[in-house]
Curated annotation (Swiss-Prot):
Covalent S-S links between cysteines: none
Annotated localization: Cytoplasm
Originating gene: ddl
EC nos: 6.3.2.4
The protein's name: D-alanine--D-alanine ligase
GO biological process, one term: peptidoglycan biosynthetic process
Length: 308
């Protein structure tokens, strides 16, 4: 028995609530198996009062999306002086903003795709850049709201400027990078293996590919040239450090090897709250390094701190 009381924060009120519940449930059960005293908290607007009364030794942040990974819950935990997992206030807020995170990563020497930051209503009926391109909400995760505009489309999709759009006014319009989906995790100062994601029946690594069993396969370590492998690892660690991440992060990449095995590698984004569901990438990447799911979670709990 470790004796540590761990509050697992899950659920919340973002569009990623179902993912968070899946992550939190898996993490809580495994931490109990490891000997921790676990309290499951389905986060609502009164979470600060709940945590202040509970006084756990550590908060395991299994939240995803706004409030959970944008610096908000991190600020609550800092104020309450409860050590917590993953990145701190500033790094979380920065990583959640895809545009600003890209600029910081690029300034540190990481290769990124050309992009524009726009209000979605500015797009209208004219292409903001030559297709193909991708439109992404600036502050969403799990591929919510991602729209791929193909070369043969004469106008941007109407959904972007319609009333049905629920992902905020700011969008990132980014050059579409063809090729393979690759990802790389960082655990503290240790860069992990590179993993290839192969969506099954999907154009890209969308919500279903991420969370539906059998909708994607993970090849870890990825079957790519050693120099490309090392380049991706270097870029993942550079982005992790430049943005100020702590604990575990995961960077996503596109590798265009259509014309050469030594093709272009582009960093897409960093995730400071990577999923911990049964189909998630980080547990698979850790497993390839000989680290079990339980060992990974224990490391995260012991790594928890304030002033992150």
């Amino acid at each position: 028995m470790t004796g540590k009381h761990v509050a697992v924060l899950m659920g919340g009120f973002s569009s990623e609530r179902p993912v968070s519940l899946s992550s939190g449930t898996a993490c809580a059960a495994t931490l109990e198996e490891r000997g921790y005293c676990v309290t499951r908290i389905d986060v609502d607007r009164n979470v600060a009062s709940v945590l202040a009364e509970l006084k756990p030794d550590v908060a395991f942040n299994a939240l995803h999306g706004p409030f959970g990974e944008d610096g908000a819950i991190q600020g609550v935990l800092e104020y309450l002086q409860i050590p917590y997992t993953h990145s701190g206030v500033l790094a979380s807020a920065l990583a959640m903003d895809k545009d600003r995170a890209k600029k910081v990563a690029a300034a540190a020497g990481v290769a990124v795709a050309s992009s524009l930051l726009l209000n979605r209503f500015e797009i209208g009926t004219e292409h903001p850049m030559e297709p193909p391109y991708v439109v992404k909400p600036v502050r969403e995760g799990s591929s919510f709201g991602v729209v791929i505009v193909k070369e043969d489309q004469t106008h941007p999709p109407q959904i972007i400027s319609s009333a049905e759009w629920n992902y905020g006014a700011e969008v990132l319009v980014e050059k579409y990078i063809p090729g393979r989906e690759l990802t790389c995790a960082v655990m503290g100062d240790r860069v992990m293996d590179v993993c290839e994601i192969i969506p099954v029946g999907h154009q890209f690594y969308d919500y279903d590919s991420k969370y539906v069993a059998g909708a994607s396969s993970h090849v870890c370590p990825a079957k790519i040239l050693p120099n490309i492998y090392q380049k991706i690892q270097t870029m993942a660690l550079t982005a992790h450090r430049a943005i100020g991440c702590r604990g575990v992060s995961r960077s996503d990449f596109r590798f265009d090897d259509r014309f050469s095995d030594d093709g272009e590698v582009i960093w897409l984004e960093i995730n400071t709250q990577p999923g911990m569901t049964p189909t998630s990438l980080v547990p698979d990447i850790a497993k390839a390094a000989g680290i079990s799911f339980g060992e990974l979670l224990s490391w995260m709990v012991e790594d928890a701190s304030c002033l992150r």
